[in-house]
C-alpha cells in the first residue's frame, strides 16, 4: 500500500512538473495596449502578444491575418 501511495505521489509530481514546463515556455504577460489584430481563427485579439500567448497556451497554430478587428 505504501508503495502505491509513493508511486501516486511521484506520478502527480511528474505531471505537475510537465505542466509547469509547458506554461514556462509560453509568454503570457502582455501589455494592455489596444492594437487589435485579426487571428486566423476568426477572433479579434487586443494585440499580437495576446494572440501569440493564446495560441501557445492552447497549442494552436493561430496567425495574424491582418491588423484591426476581424
UniProtKB/Swiss-Prot annotation:
Disulfide bonds join 26-56, 30-49, 38-70. This is Turripeptide Ici9.2. Residues 1-20 form the signal peptide. The lineage of its organism: Eukaryota, Metazoa, Spiralia, Lophotrochozoa, Mollusca. Expressed by the venom duct. The cysteine framework is IX (C-C-C-C-C-C). GO terms for cellular component: extracellular region. One of its GO terms (biological process) is cell differentiation. It is found in: Secreted. It comes from Iotyrris cingulifera. Acts as a neurotoxin by inhibiting an ion channel. May also act as a serine protease inhibitor, since it possess the kazal serine protease inhibitor signature. The keyword Electron transport does not apply.
Amino acid at each position: 500500500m505504501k508503495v502505491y501511495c509513493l508511486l501516486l505521489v511521484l506520478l502527480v509530481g511528474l505531471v505537475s512538473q510537465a505542466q509547469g514546463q509547458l506554461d514556462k515556455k509560453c509568454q503570457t504577460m502582455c501589455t494592455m495596449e489596444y492594437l487589435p489584430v485579426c487571428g486566423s481563427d476568426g477572433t479579434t485579439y487586443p494585440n499580437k502578444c495576446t494572440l501569440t500567448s493564446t495560441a501557445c497556451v492552447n497549442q494552436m497554430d493561430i496567425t495574424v491575418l491582418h491588423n484591426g478587428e476581424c
